[in-house]
Amino acid sequence: MSRTLTAIAALALSLGGCTSVGQIPPPKIASGTLHSANGAAVGTVVLLAAGDDVAINVAVTGLPPGTHGIHLHTVGSCEAPGFASAGGHLNPHSMQHGTANPAGSHLGDLPNLIVGSSGTGEVTAKLRDSRATAMAALFDADGTAIVIHAAPDDYRTDPSGTSGTRIACAVLQRG
């Protein structure tokens, strides 16, 4: 857990500019608990305000080793076993999928999560939109979920980067 907080703090500080020792850490915007298709808790998601940006940290345990695509999805619902209730990728600007796509990418496109042989993994990133724009999309009337997929995201194939089956999901809760 301390590694997670250190990673979040480092990203938040790099996004938010200089800070002095002892300054209050960036405020948490939202969080969620990731659950597998069988209902087991397999990780956490934390979103932090970082200046005009939003930092996201995903930390997991008990997932299959390998590289997994992760995305923010349009509906704050995680009905197992397939998590189809989470809808498609969060894409308020109607962009193409993938960070390698020259036409731009979805707000919901995130870096792949690498899970080691122990079943643990962690990734921290910055969302693509400003905090004000991201907040409006994340916390609209039906909310937002984050989904972990069985396969890696290739960062370009529309609409989902060939990431495969949805294996874990969390509904983001404000605060």
Pin down the residues of each PLM region:
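Bacterial N-terminal signal peptides
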Residues: 6-16
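N-terminal leader/targeting pre-sequences
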Residues: 16-67, 72-175
